[in-house]
Amino acid sequence: MSNAAPATVSRIEPANWYAGMKNPTLQLMLTGNGIREAEVTTDYPGAKIDSLVRLESPNYLLVYLNLSGAQPGDMKLRITFSKGKKGKKAIVTYPLLKREKAGEERMGFTNKDVLYMLMPDRFAQGHRDSKPVKMKTQYAIDRSQPSLRHGGDLEGIRQHLDYFTELGVTALWFTPVLENDSPDNNGASTYHGYATTDYYKVDPRFGTNEEYRRLTDEAHQKGLKIVMDMIFNHCGMEHPWVSDLPSQDWLNAPEWLAAPKQAPTAVAEGQSTTYAGGINDLYLQTSYKLTPVVDPYASEIDKRETVDGWFVPSMPDLNQRNPHVMRYLIQNSIWWIETIGIDGIRMDTYPYADAKGMASWMKELNQEYPNFNVVGESWVTEPAFTAALQKDSRITPPYMLGCKPCPAANNSKPCPKANDNKPCPVANNSKHCPRVCDNIADTPTPPNTWLNTVMDFSFFDRLNAAKYEETDPWWNGMNRIYNNFVYDYLYPNPKSVLAFLDNHDTDRFLGDGKDSLMLKQALALLLTINRIPQLYYGTEIMMNGTKAVTDGNVRKDFPGGFPGDERSAFTKEGRTKEENSMFRWLSKVLHWRQQSKAVTEGRQVQFTPYKGVYVMAHQLPTCAQAATCAQAATCPQATTCGSPNQPGTATPAGATVPGASASGSNVLLILNGTSKPATFNAERYKELWPAGQQATITAREVTSGRKYDITKDFTLSPRQTLLLEY
């Protein structure tokens, strides 16, 4: 007699799906003891099982269905666990739900939004009377320890939605909230959320899937969007896949897991945390260097370390080249969009994952949700790198997406161009030349990442270098900012690039100081440039800190968010005089920005810093310019003067053109980049004056209401910021 445990099905992922998706394919991952050899059938109308994929582990079975004709309802899956008449059978009811809205109706975040980034564990605790949640692994909640959990949750965020609307932000991005059931390790924990152990479940310490949906619904009612942080590059060590690999190629470089471990060791130079399980010589650590993915001269070892190396030993590296892994991840992102109603995704460690797999994900999301948005974290401070990752980039290297020319027969003659789709002259003409970037782009040249938004680490880097400098005639201070935008021609869409001063992985912009003048200059820039702005929680009350000792020093608890806090910075009464001053100033700018078409739709103009002063303008076209534009052979986008104007559709004389009003059509940002008084030389900027107007031009300062005549010189105080509108 066999002592083997009976076959079972203990889990199906995803637990439900949605009828009417543009891609009719559904992958179901069945998990259970001995499930690999099971047979699965269904007679549900409009559904057909295309294939069963039996992986190396006996405890997984992948079922691929085609749902092209299926309507919402309960689909019956008949599972036979062994062959023969006496084989154990089961019927599983699988819900196919009706979509709440069409994919085209899901609107993502744009440059008209301002994202507020926070860490749920450190922002606010809503469930204050509940006992600690029991998890499989050991953990502690201790607010005195910067690297342990502090107890914040989704309910705490929900309870403070009015705070965000008062401040004036329009979207919330918080670090991952999915289950991270990993043990504390040498005084550190996964409170940050980047070590997923269940891709379909909110971590119980943060709340439930239902609470996530409630938070999202109420945020939408208040005009706030929700951006979900996801990680395709890696999972957590305690994910069930790691202890029972579906297949050996489910992870990159998994060999070290089966070999004896050495004593615990530091995971990377300069990193204080250690991995309790130890590592061995087979362990492949990522180099954290992203440039090999675009480097035309990159060595194979450098590319492998970047893409296949593990971020840390406790975060196994997923293999996106495995089509089953990629299908699982793509479906997971779609499931959260449909189930929770999120408005965007921030993809962590984007270039560390396989570029071709990520492009296939982005292409499918673009097709399913054409107005949705995804931002990929791409931590390289050179614009050419991040621009190469953006959708429709002209500089994306083909080899980055795995594009290769076909081999010529015996090297006797060159292979035809990859995009002519002709037979390749291989031996006996037995093969055809594969299309470059097959399954990535409709046309193989140029390759396309399909990623709408990238992160502007170049702006972050230049701004943080410039903040303590005096602006000289050439390179330092505001010259760094000016030169950053010189390279915007590399981006297909600069207005869809996300800019920021700091985040949870960097020093706070203020460092250990409290320089309000420096912060106001940076914020004024951030909120007016051709970008999608992102703020880090607490900036509005001048929270500071550096990572010199620990990451937790830049991830401090928001005052008033937790039981026992002495004060609450959520209220005017709980903030200090200095904090209220910054909060009021920033709130005015944020609320003004929501109404400023000049900032979000206008043309950006910048002037080289002159005698320490940096000037940037945003202009909407006037009615006269719109009329001229309408008669031109080519027409710049002018959404406020028509929709937009097309050649030959001149604006009638005297007509009122929506949005082309005199007041508010122009925004002028003036920054004194020195610690001394400086002069605004009006004559230098007269091209910004409305046509035919040489007399007084009165501009209103947005935060103070003070009036300035921009046709006259005036003096700027040290590090002064003027945000003018006229």
Language-model-derived ranges and their functions:
Residues 5-36, 96-99:
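Beta-strand/beta-sandwich contexts
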Residues 21-85:
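Immunoglobulin-like IPT/TIG beta-sandwich domains and homologous Ig-like subdomains
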Residues 88-97:
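Edge beta-strands of extracellular beta-sandwich domains
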Residues 96-117, 122, 126:
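Low-complexity, Pro/Ser/Thr- and charge-rich linker/hinge segments at domain boundaries
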Residues 124-334, 339, 358-369, 373, ...:
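Substrate-binding/active-site clefts of carbohydrate-active enzymes
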Residues 234, 332-334, 338-492, 497, ...:
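Active-site-proximal helices and loops of the catalytic beta/alpha 8
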Residues 591, 607-624, 649, 657-688:
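Carbohydrate-binding surface patches
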Residues 708-726:
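C-terminal beta-strand-rich structural cap/linker in extracellular carbohydrate-active enzymes
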